[in-house]
Amino acid sequence: MNRPNRINEEIRVKEVRLIDQNGEQAGIVSIQQALEMMAEQAELDLVEISPNAEPPVCRIMNYGKFLYEKSKTAKEQKKKQKVVQVKEIKFRPGTDEGDYQVKLRSLIRFLEDGDKAKITVRFRGREMAHQDIGLDVLERVKNDLAEISVVESAPGKLEGRQAVMVLAPKKK
């Protein structure tokens, strides 16, 4: 069986630093003494906690309960982690005020949820002649969201027929 920790008779060293079930140091003892102490406190296992220490550190505990607690804390930590996503909102150079406000509210929601926001301004046809209008839209978005975000990548040159800017939420 492949376990992260060796237990009981799997421990193949002469001496171990023993910690009893109360978490108190019992000192350095032979492996036989440790197994006998474990037998006295029936239903408990001798678990190798730190195999690389000199001598290895072993603890008397209920191994099943130990594994359960370990997996429970790992699940809790995994729950707390948040995967940052990049949400995209597309504008046009001629986006009207009402649409602009709706899209701005969406951007605020994305940033408050901890996601990054990618703002794209797409140019069609003759709009390419007025790229400055599109860049003004990006500048306006940047200024409106300055309190809750930082610019991660500023709009430089156009990528094909679109200008792109990425905003990240400010650290609290």
Swiss-Prot record:
Keywords, in A-Z order: Cytoplasm, Initiation factor, Protein biosynthesis
Spell out the InterPro entries in the cross-references.
T_IF-3_C_sf, T_IF-3_N_sf, Translation_initiation_fac3_CS, Translation_initiation_fac_3, Translation_initiation_fac_3_C, Translation_initiation_fac_3_N
GO MF terms held by the record: ribosome binding; translation initiation factor activity
- Keyword hit for Cytoplasm: yes
Q: Where in the cell is it found?
A: Cytoplasm
The record ties this protein, via Pfam families, to: IF3_C, IF3_N
Q: Name one GO cellular component term.
A: cytosol
Which BP terms does GO give this entry? ribosome disassembly
Record's keyword annotation contains Cytoplasm: yes
Which residue positions does UniProt flag as site: Important for 30S binding? Answer: 100, 103
Q: What does this protein do?
A: IF-3 binds to the 30S ribosomal subunit and shifts the equilibrium between 70S ribosomes and their 50S and 30S subunits in favor of the free subunits, thus enhancing the availability of 30S subunits on which protein synthesis initiation begins.
HAMAP family recorded: IF_3 (MF_00080)
User: What is the protein name for this chain?
Assistant: Translation initiation factor IF-3
